[in-house]
């Protein structure tokens, strides 16, 4: 089990939840500190910049584990730096395969700069590999997901891809969505971009992608398997694990 946290973005936090987005990094840091206090069984008396908790709350049962790894999803330079300082693992976002190795290396350097051992932090893959016979359908679903995040989930995802050199593709997707809606935006996503982020294919293709991610520094892989029965799924997972 891991605990996954992230700041989300201003559009979701302010328009959906109805609360101010900033200071998002301070809020996230305090979440991490509070969760660790609770799991350690300490009385919850916390004096942060945003949260002040005085009642000394404790869990009414002993946790099975006193420490659950906290992974943080982050993509802006400030949030990635904070992740290196406080998290047990990093969930990178919107990093195509060809950019993965330098981005992971840069993160591990931030961990060193924070005085921590980079080998003790786990980096999860930024995109899933899906073993499926319905490759075209899976690719279209990934295109729809990517187009929606680029156009409707705030600036961070769009800016991340622009930073990595995909400004033209991002502009085309946004223009198509504005003019033709979801279907047009989805159709504008280049095959090469979506496949570098979310691979769907045969077991062999997915094994190759997992190996490429591992070579780029990924420790934990996100895998989906579409199989007819549990025995087939186990065999596929065994091949992916190698």
Question: Where are each of the predicted segments found?
Answer:
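Active-site-adjacent structural elements that line small-molecule/cofactor binding pockets in enzymes
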Residues: 1-242
């Amino acid at each position: 089990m891991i605990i996954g946290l992230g700041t989300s973005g201003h559009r979701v936090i302010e328009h959906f939840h109805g609360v101010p987005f900033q200071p998002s990094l301070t809020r996230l840091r305090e979440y991490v500190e509070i969760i660790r206090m609770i799991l350690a069984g300490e009385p919850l008396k916390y004096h942060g910049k945003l949260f002040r908790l005085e009642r000394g709350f404790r869990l009414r049962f002993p946790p099975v584990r006193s420490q659950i790894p906290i992974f943080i999803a982050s993509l802006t330079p400030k949030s990635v730096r904070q992740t290196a300082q406080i998290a047990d693992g990093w969930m990178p976002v919107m990093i195509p395969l060809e950019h993965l190795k330098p981005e992971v290396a840069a993160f591990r350097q931030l961990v060193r700069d924070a005085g921590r051992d980079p080998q003790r932090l786990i980096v999860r893959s930024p995109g899933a590999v899906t073993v499926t016979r319905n490759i075209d359908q899976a690719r279209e679903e990934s295109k729809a997901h990517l187009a929606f995040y680029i156009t409707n989930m705030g600036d961070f995802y769009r800016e991340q891809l622009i930073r990595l050199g995909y400004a033209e593709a991002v502009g085309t997707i946004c223009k198509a969505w504005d003019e033709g809606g979801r279907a047009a935006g989805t159709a504008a996503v280049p095959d090469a971009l979506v496949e570098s982020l979310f691979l769907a294919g045969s077991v062999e293709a997915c094994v190759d992608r997992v190996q490429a991610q591992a070579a780029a520094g990924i420790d934990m892989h996100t895998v989906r398997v579409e199989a007819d029965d549990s025995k087939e799924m186990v065999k596929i997972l065994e091949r992916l694990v190698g």
